[in-house]
């Protein structure tokens, strides 16, 4: 089975590269075998359409070509030539003899150079794809003309975009949105990780420059004796994975068990209990987590009660605490456990609702057959109920794990202004023991303006999430499992 998975993955990768190779092969064929107007399309993009009397398309492609040229000359050339250095002229005030005033010079802004250069590269790449495709289409029109086939008018092409090609029309705006608002920012994040963009190199007053892999070297502990990022990264990554595991599976298993309990015929007033558990969903996390943080703070109501009943003194006597309060959210071990427990309280009701919906659709004939055959409740749960739940909720389980790797709210709202690290190495890297990679990243950008290291960490988070998701889904969808539950 593993060999089949590897073969399917290899086939997918091979098919991807073959499609790219086929695209360039079609372009080469069009250039070699095309007539003069197809070859002229290499220079004038509307030539092939004009020859085949598709004048509207010819005008549109010509206007597109002119727009790309104007964009390149008027906009891109202001930034792309400076991309290799990200600017050399710093901001400073100079005295203007004409106006007799101090004015800012014509300085470089490293961030705008990087951003608009990347934007220009994306535009050029898209224009290149359109250019290649335009030549291929011009050759296709030539072959249709030679074969005596009907060539659509512009009106017929428009009609096809609302009929057989309507899916392309619907996807155009979403794809543009993903390209502009997702792809370009991710590309910017990746490139910033290879610069020294931080508080000491903050545009527009200062310039930043390329530093290669030095940020990743520092992150993985190769930055020398003065670098503590490697030390902090290992510990933050370890806690992130531990947190994601327990936060995912405690709520998943807890939700299933709670759903089974509420669906049991022996449970009285199940609707009332279900409503009480759903209350935690109804209250926004921003409110509930801040309240819980205050309850469990060093001077909160829970510590007051524990001190009154003597629990704090007992824990001090056996060495579990060394202060006059229980450090629920202010000491490493205590905070880790409390965060996971509080997350169970928040997350179990969600999983309970999901599990309830799945259990309502569990094949009753299978359950009845198992009981007739003498299976116990535990055997039914292990052999029928749980496999069915895993099959239906497996994708949600994977996404929950990835979501918990990036679960900013729970960690930040529970520990912000409450937890302070005493580990100097962690503090030097602007991290603490309860940070996830995403909260560490946030603190680096918002509090310390260390965008270079935050970008490097962001890339690591993306790689972890992407690899886990691809591997997990690949394992999950292998074989024909759906037939088992038909």
Regions found by a protein language model. Name each.
Residues 2-25, 35-36, 43-47, 55-58, ...:
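N-terminal signal-anchor/first transmembrane alpha helix
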Residues 54-55, 450:
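Residues in the short coil linking paired helices within alpha-helical repeat scaffolds
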Residues 53, 75-91, 122:
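Transmembrane-helix bundle segments that line or gate the permeation/cavity pathway
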Residues 83-105:
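Perimembrane loop-to-helix junctions flanking transmembrane segments
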Residues 76-82, 166-486:
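A structural signal for multi-pass alpha-helical bundles of membrane permease subunits
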